[in-house]
Amino acid sequence: MQINNQSRDVFYVSDGTAITCETLGHVVLGQFPFIPNEKTFPFVESQDKVADVVKEIETSYQRNGVKPLVFFSIVVPGVREMLLEAPAYSYDVLESIVQKVQDDIQMAPAPKLQRSRSVGKDSDTYFDRIAAIEYTLAHDDGITLKGLEQADIILLGVSRSGKTPTSLYMAMQFGLRVVNYPFIAEDVKMMRLLPEFEVHRHKLFGLTITPERLNEIRENRLSGSDYASEEQCKLELDTVEALFRREAIPYINTSSLSVEEISTRILERAGMKRRLFG
């Protein structure tokens, strides 16, 4: 992970899944104009595990000359103390909120490992989430168009417009079954809505992006290619947006939005409700 004026190393560390750390971290970092180089460490429940994390943090500091940012949620005192000794700017994502609730309700918290929650206790929620994730992964990037009747929403857009991360976030956080389908360069010559989507028009939602941002993203992946050229990016976007307008498919521009914001706006625009919370 290299440091420059537009990037910084960020670590998410938790004794649970780290989803809370990532979610809150993304919201906070979205307020700052730099690109986070992120790494996540879930289920850090022992001093041995946190020692490995500390080594990574130390390596980042030594390599870049600046302290990385660490968003964490750790219950075990010994593990927490070891993490706080690392050369980083560390932020407990729950501490200030828990303290405020404690002050307001005059009740001491009883911290416990996030992992200790029983699957059986929330089995319906757990299996709904797993089913949504499995469905979404199976329908990522146009892998298959079978089973569209089970989809909650179908995301359309050019390659690298944010469909995959948005799909997975909606599955993981909201328990929604999401299909995402990419329009590729060959589609531009005869852009049309696939017959498979006709009966599911009410589920269609488009993602678009500015040509400049798309060019930047594609250059990082395939620098100097026709695929990444400004001309190709603009051509694809103009063609796809024309399709969205012609077919009355709602869409949003993802250029300056976080995955969390994209997902929430889709729910709002599509009039959908979350199946799960958190």
Swiss-Prot record:
SS bond list: none
Keywords, comma-separated and alphabetical: Kinase, Nucleotide-binding, Serine/threonine-protein kinase, Transferase
Any one GO MF annotation of this record: protein serine/threonine kinase activity
Chain residues that bind ADP: G157, V158, S159, R160, S161, G162, K163, T164
Residues that span the membrane, as ranges: none
The protein, known as: Putative phosphoenolpyruvate synthase regulatory protein
Similarity comment: family membership: Belongs to the pyruvate, phosphate/water dikinase regulatory protein family. PSRP subfamily.
InterPro entries assigned: Kinase-pyrophosphorylase (IPR005177), PSRP (IPR026530)
Annotated EC: 2.7.11.33, 2.7.4.28
UniProt enzyme class: transferase
Name of one Pfam family that matches: Kinase-PPPase
Reactions catalysed according to its record: [pyruvate, water dikinase] + ADP = [pyruvate, water dikinase]-phosphate + AMP + H(+); [pyruvate, water dikinase]-phosphate + phosphate + H(+) = [pyruvate, water dikinase] + diphosphate
Protein's organism: Vibrio parahaemolyticus serotype O3:K6 (strain RIMD 2210633)
